[in-house]
Amino acid sequence: MSKAYEQAGVNIEAGYEAVKRMKSHVERTNRLGVMGTFGGFGGMFDLSELNLKEPVLISGTDGVGTKLKLAFMVDKHDTIGVDCVAMCVNDIVAQGAEPLYFLDYVALGKAEPAKIEQIVKGVADGCVQSGAALIGGETAEMPGLYEEDEYDLAGFAVGACEKSAIVTGERIVEGDVLIGIASSGVHSNGYSLVRKIVFADRQYAVDAIVENYEDLGPIGEALLVPTKLYAKPVLAALKAADVHGCAHVTGGGFYENLPRMMPEGLATEIDLGSWPVLRIFEFLKDKGQLEDKDLYNVFNMGIGFVIAAPAAEADKVMAAVEANGEKAYTIGRVIKGNGVVFNGTHDGSLV
């Protein structure tokens, strides 16, 4: 091989080795509808295998934001791919889509096959958890654009559902019950604030065990817990009950995301104390001296996904969610108005 490209900072052989390492991870995501073989110029999927009468494709793209910086600091790269898949898949599931396939994009300052394999392993783990196939992607070595130990990660998810089954929120009415599904932690939003509080202002080391928060373990790892994937519990709920609307609680927290599913003239009324707030949020509130409004405007506060359904259907929704291994809580209701209204306090209900 010519050394000219390598002298410019691009190691082609390392790229080939990374692709070899990816193969087994990609193959375990295979599902009905996948066509072609690993390494083709484009990923292919046979939509006819789904037997949908009026199929509608629903797509989403996203990244992981500055949570990547934390992965660099901890030097842990095998779960950040789960975050990438979750950020894309949870959005399309909120509109009723069954995830079908996923494509990833990794841009690095230096191609390190072992690190790339760990990143793609996480992506594949997320695909397996959500039922999507990893049918393509791009790994680009970009010396001069990224530092040698840095990378960026983004993805693109495509799902499908019957045209008649699209979840738009248009059917939400006053009196509908709001069912929240538990989050696993901070997920993938708010990390610029997290890093400022924890590492800039408080100057904790990533492996620090913080006094009075010893139960969290090393703080860096507690903050790296991957985003929960909601595809299976939410799709089960959509089959089991008459669901009127869904919201993925991502950037902007409750204040921005719950109104996204609401028809004009309706608001969400949230009962604080109706679910356990995760300890990691108590830690961030304490160390960052944050007001409650800031918390609910940035973080998921322990609820990563919200379903709106008629009161008579709420038990069916909760049973379907919990049958798929997730915790569900009745957290409020739909009222006349606009935005989000909070009632009560959490009364120290922390886990």
Curated annotation (Swiss-Prot):
It is found in: Cytoplasm. GO terms for molecular function: ATP binding; phosphoribosylamine-glycine ligase activity; phosphoribosylformylglycinamidine cyclo-ligase activity. It is an enzyme of class 6 (ligase). It catalyses: 2-formamido-N(1)-(5-O-phospho-beta-D-ribosyl)acetamidine + ATP = 5-amino-1-(5-phospho-beta-D-ribosyl)imidazole + ADP + phosphate + H(+). One of its GO terms (biological process) is adenine biosynthetic process. Pathway: Purine metabolism; IMP biosynthesis via de novo pathway; 5-amino-1-(5-phospho-D-ribosyl)imidazole from N(2)-formyl-N(1)-(5-phospho-D-ribosyl)glycinamide: step 2/2. Keywords: ATP-binding, Cytoplasm, Ligase, Nucleotide-binding, Purine biosynthesis. This is Phosphoribosylformylglycinamidine cyclo-ligase. The gene is purM.
